[in-house]
């Protein structure tokens, strides 16, 4: 029997965290190529460190996207995040770009004669998850850990009062108590944030961030028993890539469900949508969210698996965690019929061949609002009625 009374913790990191700066730059490169050629292929990794950005990887795309363009886009991304410090400044960083052509051996596995982009770009397993704990059908701990940091970043960028004294680099962690399987309160809050004013101590920083944290969390979830840890190490002035080197793809649990669901191991950022690490994980979330939105379960985990060069998934697995109203084996068949789970089918259904990825690089790929231009299309619940009618 699953436990119904327990504590569960998830963490998030801000857009200024070194690894997230790297994710942002990698996805900015992806967007640049997809904007020029929707069928572009990319696998882009970024290293960020003191006064330096290194971009490397494989590309199949138009020559119209130049390294000079990518350098300018990189500087714009770093500027948007907010880095103007001596050890990492959008204007002064050295930007080195090492991109080369995609391997012909990989390309032949993905291409099929007369049918471009037919096979999966790699083997792997991908998971999707949804739960009715929040309006976005996300687990509460990761949803609110993201919201805290997003709200603080918005306030910092808008220069709202003392929030302007905060820096781009931050981390949050939220511990939620569950009773009868439902989230009821926050027992621990951890927030570490860079601050530009060296005179600030932990108490000063808490005075700045506490109103935003309280507003981000559901009313009544924070009480006298909630324990706060705000900048517990004290001073946090040197932050971002100047404090720690960053790499693309190192925050895969932050990017997904905060540890509340399994993870297949593949990162998202820097990859075009022929890479099933990304597109199939989005499809699995889309299916899981629609299962919960349809009222077929309160929680749903979906696994997909693929082989390189093979169009159809090798398997699908559904776990409703004892909360379902339908047979899981039958639901697996219904889901296979409801959505073409080939890489091409996923890209077509979710309209993934668009420059929509830089925005996903911080505050979670899931639990976001769908955008009018196709961003976060996998968060739509337009499949719910179809799934419901199948039963």
UniProtKB/Swiss-Prot annotation:
It catalyses: L-methionine + ATP + H2O = S-adenosyl-L-methionine + phosphate + diphosphate. It comes from the Bacteria. Pathway: Amino-acid biosynthesis; S-adenosyl-L-methionine biosynthesis; S-adenosyl-L-methionine from L-methionine: step 1/1. Binds 2 divalent ions per subunit. It is found in: Cytoplasm. One of its GO terms (molecular function) is methionine adenosyltransferase activity. Residues 102-112 are annotated as: Flexible loop. Its EC number is 2.5.1.6. ATP binds at residues 17, 169-171, 235-236, 244, 250-251, 267, 271. GO terms for biological process: one-carbon metabolic process; S-adenosylmethionine biosynthetic process. Mg(2+) binds at residue 19. Pfam families: S-AdoMet_synt_C, S-AdoMet_synt_M, S-AdoMet_synt_N. GO terms for cellular component: cytoplasm. Residues 1-20 are annotated as: Disordered. Keywords: ATP-binding, Cytoplasm, Magnesium, Metal-binding, Nucleotide-binding, One-carbon metabolism, Potassium, Transferase. Belongs to the AdoMet synthase family. Catalyzes the formation of S-adenosylmethionine (AdoMet) from methionine and ATP. The overall synthetic reaction is composed of two sequential steps, AdoMet formation and the subsequent tripolyphosphate hydrolysis which occurs prior to release of AdoMet from the enzyme. This is S-adenosylmethionine synthase. It comes from Methylorubrum populi (strain ATCC BAA-705 / NCIMB 13946 / BJ001) (Methylobacterium populi).
């Amino acid at each position: 029997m699953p436990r119904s009374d327990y504590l569960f913790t998830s963490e998030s990191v801000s857009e200024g965290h070194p690894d997230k700066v790297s994710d942002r730059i990698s996805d900015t490169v992806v967007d640049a190529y997809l904007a020029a050629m929707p069928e572009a292929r990319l696998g882009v990794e970024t290293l960020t460190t003191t006064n330096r950005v290194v971009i490397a990887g494989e590309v199949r795309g138009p020559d119209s996207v130049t390294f000079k363009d990518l350098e300018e886009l990189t500087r714009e991304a770093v500027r948007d995040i907010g880095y103007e410090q001596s050890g990492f400044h959008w204007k002064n960083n050295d930007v080195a770009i090492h991109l080369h052509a995609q391997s012909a051996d990989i390309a032949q596995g993905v291409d099929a004669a007369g049918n471009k982009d037919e096979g999966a770009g790699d083997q792997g397993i991908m998971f999707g998850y949804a739960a009715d704990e929040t309006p976005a059908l996300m687990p509460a701990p990761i949803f609110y850990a993201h919201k805290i940091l997003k709200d603080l970043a918005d306030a910092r960028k808008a220069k709202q009062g003392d929030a302007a004294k905060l820096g781009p680099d931050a981390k949050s962690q939220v511990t939620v108590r569950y009773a009868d399987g439902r989230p009821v309160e926050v027992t621990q809050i951890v927030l570490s944030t860079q601050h530009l004013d060296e005179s600030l101590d932990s108490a000063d920083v808490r005075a700045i961030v506490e109103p935003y944290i309280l507003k981000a969390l559901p009313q009544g979830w924070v009480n006298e028993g909630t324990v706060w840890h705000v900048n517990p190490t004290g001073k946090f002035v040197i932050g971002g890539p100047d404090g720690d080197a960053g790499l693309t793809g190192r925050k895969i649990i932050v990017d997904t469900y905060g540890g509340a669901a399994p993870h297949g191991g593949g990162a998202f950022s820097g990859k075009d949508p022929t890479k099933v690490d990304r597109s199939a994980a989005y499809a699995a979330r889309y299916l899981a969210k629609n299962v919960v939105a349809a009222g077929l379960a309160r929680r749903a985990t979906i696994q997909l698996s693929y082989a390189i060069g093979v169009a159809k998934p090798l398997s699908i697995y559904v776990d409703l965690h004892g909360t379902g109203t339908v047979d899981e084996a039958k639901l697996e068949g219904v889901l296979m019929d409801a959505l073409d789970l080939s890489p091409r089918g996923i890209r077509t259904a979710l309209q993934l061949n668009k420059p929509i990825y830089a925005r996903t690089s911080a505050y979670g790929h899931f639990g976001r609002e769908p955008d009018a231009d196709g961003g976060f299309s996998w968060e739509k619940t337009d499949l719910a009625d179809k799934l419901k009618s199948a039963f």
